[in-house]
Amino acid sequence: MDVIARLRHWALARPRVLLVDAPAATTLRWSVEAELDRRGWPLALSPADTDLLVVLGQPGPELAEAVDVLWSQVSEPRYRGDVQRPSDVAVALDGGRAALIRRAG
């Protein structure tokens, strides 16, 4: 493995996560935040600061449109995941991290 690939892998070992929660997804947000704390993954403060965009719950049409605009502002490598149930949290985060590492390749 070359130096650049190692640096990319290291940088994405703890991806910065930006959460977008739909109305009535508070419990789901708590589940995701608890899992992020357990993993030691930081929350992003803006699209420019994120690697992994996670949409919680089912956004309505207006929020979905806003999420698309937000997504367009996230730089590569990036990954967008949707979480509908607390049981999906770990799988979504693991899949997102794996996809980021592949894309950074």
Which residue stretches match the model-derived regions?
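Cofactor-cradling patches in redox/metallo enzymes
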Residues: 8-105
